[in-house]
Swiss-Prot record:
This is tRNA dimethylallyltransferase. The gene is miaA. The keyword Transmembrane does not apply. One of its GO terms (biological process) is tRNA modification. Keywords: ATP-binding, Magnesium, Nucleotide-binding, Transferase, tRNA processing.
């Protein structure tokens, strides 16, 4: 067993000795894993045990009518396996990390009151980091300021907000991409509301739900073999194309006043379909509630999806841009479709790569708060750490553990 700061890692032997098969009534479990790794199947099994309630930790599942591309459980599955924080906003709305943390805090209390263990399951690692490592105390948005900034963005474009940010918060201006609508808008809102740059707020001490002295947090990171995961990703994408991801995006454009910079439209899969629809000059962009120019400008200079397909994508892009027909020819459309699928596959693999990086970061969490060390516990007992000592010490500390398969995580939780 190793102990580091406020957090503790347990060996496999320690797990079986001190934790299995039961978790404490005040437990909170985070099941963290990359996309397509089998989290949902395990979550369903755990729900059937009667011990858990499910809380989604997925920034894409919050959106209504975005089902195929997010691998969201269907209506029948959601009825049988209820998930908190699924289908809570429309695709043109935003949902901040702070809002997520506040919602989770409320839901954890509710689960415990119901005699259940909250199982936080999903792949949005930024959400997990906010829960486990904390958020800087940036003030919540003021509705009037938000409306003012949104009107400014609509009138003058995100570039105007980005230029303004450069004058009032050089650190954020340098850190953010000029097209990152959500974060630029938020940074401007914070400055107008507080007269303090968001970069200053972000340097202040963090506050994490996992520090709650009345709860026992277990953070489980499942990091499967990458070749196995890549095969699973390909299989999942094949299912999405067959189930109608392109049709789903067209339906979203028909029913919502979307823009290409919205967080929902930057989700992996949806972004690539949008680009495909632009390249094939799809008539959906003639909808009166859509700004066609915004979409075409957003994809005017698309990047090849990977080094391996760079030459192929360049040829495809050339064919698409040279057509003068109202709609792309069948051949050009087929090429654009292949490009879309290539890019979606590459983007999903890159997402998984980032998730692995985040998981490793989570497993290195530490806190400088003064707590007993392994040596001090040992010295105060005998030559070894007894089970009672460990039980006393592990109380109200975040327990970190990593697995290479979902089956190992299952054995920990069932």
């Amino acid at each position: 067993m190793t102990i580091k700061g406020k957090y503790m890692r347990l060996s496999s032997d320690s797990l079986s000795s001190y934790l299995s098969p039961n978790l404490a009534d005040n437990s909170v479990v985070c099941l963290m894993a990359p996309t397509a790794s089998g989290k949902t199947a395990l979550a369903y099994e755990l729900y059937n045990s009667g011990r858990y309630e499910l809380i989604s930790v997925d920034s894409a599942l919050v959106y209504r009518d975005m089902t195929v591309g997010t691998a969201k459980p269907n209506a029948a599955e959601l009825a049988r396996y209820p998930h908190h924080l699924v289908d809570i906003i429309d695709p043109m709305q935003s949902y901040s990390v702070a809002e997520f943390v506040n919602d989770v805090a409320r839901l954890i209390d509710s689960c415990h009151q119901n005699g259940k263990i909250p199982l936080l399951v999903g792949g949005t690692m930024m959400y997990y980091m906010a829960l486990l490592d904390g958020l800087s105390p940036v003030p919540d948005s003021d509705d009037s300021v938000r409306a003012r900034v949104e009107q400014w963005r609509q009138d003058e474009g995100i570039s105007a907000l980005y230029d303004y940010l450069g004058k009032v918060d050089a650190i954020s201006h340098e850190r953010l991409n000029a097209t990152d609508t959500q974060r630029i808008t938020r940074a401007v809102e914070v400055y107008l509301q507080t007269d303090i740059p968001i970069s200053d707020w972000q340097r202040q001490p963090k506050q994490a739900l996992a520090y709650n002295p009345n709860q026992q947090w277990h953070a489980l990171a499942v990091m499967p073999d990458r070749p196995w995961l890549h095969t699973r990703i390909e299989q999942r994408l094949d299912i999405m194309w067959r189930e109608g991801l392109v049709a789903e995006v067209i339906s979203l454009l028909e029913h919502y006043p979307l823009t290409p910079g919205l967080p929902s439209m930057r989700c992996v899969g949806y972004r690539q379909v949008l680009e495909y629809l632009v390249q094939t000059n799809h008539p959906v962009f003639e909808q009166p509630h859509l700004d066609k120019a915004q979409f075409y400008d957003a994809f005017a200079q698309s990047e090849p999806s990977s080094n391996e397909s760079k030459e192929q994508d360049t040829t495809i892009q050339s064919s698409i841009t040279q057509t003068h027909l109202p709609m792309a020819t069948a051949q050009t459309e087929a090429l654009a479709c292949q490009q879309m699928q290539n890019k979606a596959l590459y983007a999903t693999r890159q997402l998984a790569k980032r998730q692995y990086t985040w998981l490793r970061k989570v497993m290195q969490l530490s806190n400088t708060a003064a707590v007993p060390t392994t040596e001090s516990i040992t010295a105060s007992s005998t030559s070894t750490v007894g089970s009672d000592d460990v039980t006393d010490f592990q109380k109200n500390k975040l327990i970190l553990h990593s697995f290479s398969t979902m089956e190992q995580a299952r054995a920990y939780l069932v």
